[in-house]
């Protein structure tokens, strides 16, 4: 499988996101996962007129109402834990990084599904194969118990910005490990 990336350089431009999704459909993409906030890509997937369906993975809101026959799953970032822990730090005159229940790298903080910072919003059981929900729940449990790294596996690639920048996830990638 090949992953193609299109950058919109915005979180919330319906027309730009639709255009990027349409380009992916025209390039014979079979699954579009978005990391922007409008329903544009889901609408493009739902309305794509071709023999092979174009499925969709949503971000920050359920897309099932927009793409009932194409939206597989949606997830969201849940900042509530970060905000609660940050406010606690401020009220107790502590550094935020000392109070975060997650990984911190200098001034960057992050956590995933294991800490509740990322959540699955819905799985469209009307279109996914039987047993998908249970498989997702099992995968989440493995992540929560530290038995599965999200950014790891037999995947390699090349950066779209620098062809000399090779990506190899046979060794797990720690996001933002070298930031700040």
Where are these regions (language model features)?
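A residue-level marker of the well-folded mature domains of exported/periplasmic proteins
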Residues: 1-180
